[in-house]
């Protein structure tokens, strides 16, 4: 956590929030095992290094105009998105059984469903899901979150 360096404010909460999210993703990506450690954490984070990034993020959201309750909830939403995205990038959400017999059976079942036309929407999206760069996906999600905060505040 001490490696997280909150980016300097640019005076635009949209960019400040996105830059902080990018930095958090970068830091988490540098340490693949930190996600497991965080998931196993049984007590609240209370060290100065662990709470400063939280304080900074909530400050950005308060600066956007959110009241303290909405800022806290938005903090959890942004955090869940960033950590979930990093877990997905690291393959933690897919499972560790790649190549084993059960996983190969699941892939075969999935291929049959696609071939049979049972998943028309997913089939249509598969090329995009497969080829979309991680950075592009991450930025798309950040844009949705930032626009959601603006919507909550009655801005377009």
Q: What are these regions, as identified by a protein language model?
A:
Residues 1-2:
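Short, basic, alpha-helical segments at the C-terminal edge of helix-turn-helix-like DNA-binding modules
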Residues 5-54, 71, 75:
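Hydrophobic alpha-helical connector segments
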Residues 6, 33-34, 87-91, 151-155:
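Charged, solvent-exposed alpha-helical segments that act as regulatory interaction surfaces
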Residues 9, 26, 63-67, 130:
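Amphipathic alpha-helical interaction elements
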Residues 34, 67, 84, 119-120:
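A general structural signal for well-ordered secondary-structure junctions
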Residues 54-92, 96, 103-108:
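A contiguous pocket-lining binding segment that forms or flanks enzyme active sites
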Residues 63, 91-156:
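C-terminal peripheral helix-coil segments that are non-catalytic and often amphipathic
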């Amino acid at each position: 956590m001490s490696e997280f360096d909150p980016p300097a404010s640019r005076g635009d909460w949209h960019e400040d929030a996105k830059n902080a999210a990018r930095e958090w993703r970068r830091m988490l990506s540098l340490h693949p095992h930190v996600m497991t450690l965080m998931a196993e954490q049984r007590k609240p984070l209370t060290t100065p290094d662990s709470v400063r990034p939280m304080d900074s993020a909530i400050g950005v959201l308060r600066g956007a105009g959110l009241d303290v309750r909405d800022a806290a909830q938005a903090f959890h939403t942004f955090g869940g998105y960033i950590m979930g995205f990093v877990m997905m990038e690291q393959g933690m959400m897919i499972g560790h059984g790649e190549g084993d017999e059960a996983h190969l059976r699941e892939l075969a079942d999935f291929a049959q469903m696609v071939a049979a036309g049972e998943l028309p929407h997913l089939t249509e999206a598969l090329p995009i899901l497969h080829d979309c760069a991680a950075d592009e996906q991450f930025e798309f999600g950040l844009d949705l979150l930032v626009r959601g905060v603006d919507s909550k505040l009655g801005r377009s």
